[in-house]
Amino acid sequence: MGNCWCRFEPLNHRVSANAKSESPKEQSPTVEDKHIKEVQKLPSNPKEVEDLRRDSAANPLIAFTYEELKNITSNFRQDRVLGGGGFGSVYKGFIKEDLGDQEVPEPLPVAVKVHDGDNSFQGHREWLAEVIFLGQLSHPNLVKLIGYCCEDNHRVLIYEYMARGSVENNLFSRVLLPLSWAIRMKIAFGAAKGLAFLHEAKKPVIYRDFKTSNILLDMDYNAKLSDFGLAKDGPVGDKSHVSTRIMGTYGYAAPEYIMTGHLTPGSDVYSFGVVLLELLTGRKSLDKSRPTREQNLIDWALPLLKEKKKVLNIVDPKMNCEYPVKAVQKAAMLAYHCLNRNPKARPLMRDIVDSLEPLQATEEEALLVPPVQKAVITIIDEMPKNGLKKVEELKKVEEVKKVIEDAC
């Protein structure tokens, strides 16, 4: 969706390097039997998929034919490709006809995610998970699934189009303008609300693959969670966790999940802490291009998050000191608590939402000219149109330096 689909990782890249292998020899007959039953239970033809979706869906999803998708994407033209990965490709398309009861007065842009002939159990399960979860759940901070296609060997998902793409592309881009502090906190707030909604749903859901490439942005930088292929039903009743295959993305996955396969809402909280730290520093969770001791963001930054003065040294320099210092310190402490190695000591997502709310800028504040830029504009306006003498120019330069120092 938008530029959002530019970095989808193949399934084998999602598994942590420290994950325990799951060879058949290590699996007990009970687990194998359960696996076989799961395969047998999974709906595989269009009617079974539609029946299952209709029985559990809160959102009216549309079952598209493959021929309709060819029309929507101009026959999957190459210049419509938005991105791709291990699952296949994503195309930009336009729906020109009414969608059931919904009128389409003008072409509606959509993102069409085509699974590349992966009809394995895992590939079909991830595709189906998105249909089920996004069919059941509706929230402003979850990407909207419009429909799907389950025809012959084709497995396709149709989403709302997210104009600004992924947080990953915006945060780490060398071409796009740097994200302001206000926008970064808006993104964190929106993503936190999405996770909190999942954790507090009637049937709790653990997202399991929270990372910057899975957070999408609309034109107003509203954040929405996408890609529910690895999402899992959360623990219910007196259960503290669910046991599952170790999947996710290295650098974001919680350490206890990597070690044991025990998945809890706290696993998502840890991943949120990683993303919040990326927003603070402008650095990737893992970056082999940096000096050895700085390649792992958590190892490098975690000891500094509690230090009110030192933490300012790791803030993204692309923001040019244009941020409220106290808010940065509060966000850093929040990230520190999310990254606690003890999952029981991490905050709940609802508490994280409450902590981020006071850090949100008003619409008016977000539109204000940053103090350094404002000072420079003022100085330039005061300059005589016929120019300045050299000594006066130097004086103005010193004034600008002083303003920058004060702002930082």
From Swiss-Prot:
Lipidated residues (N-myristoyl glycine): 2
Matches recorded under Gene3D superfamilies: Phosphorylase Kinase, domain 1 (3.30.200.20), Transferase(Phosphotransferase) domain 1 (1.10.510.10)
Entry's Gene Ontology cellular component terms: plasma membrane; plasmodesma
GO BP: defense response
Physiological role: May be involved in plant defense signaling.
Family named by the database record: Belongs to the protein kinase superfamily. Ser/Thr protein kinase family.
Name by which UniProt lists this protein: Probable serine/threonine-protein kinase PBL16
Lineage: Eukaryota, Viridiplantae, Streptophyta, Embryophyta, Tracheophyta
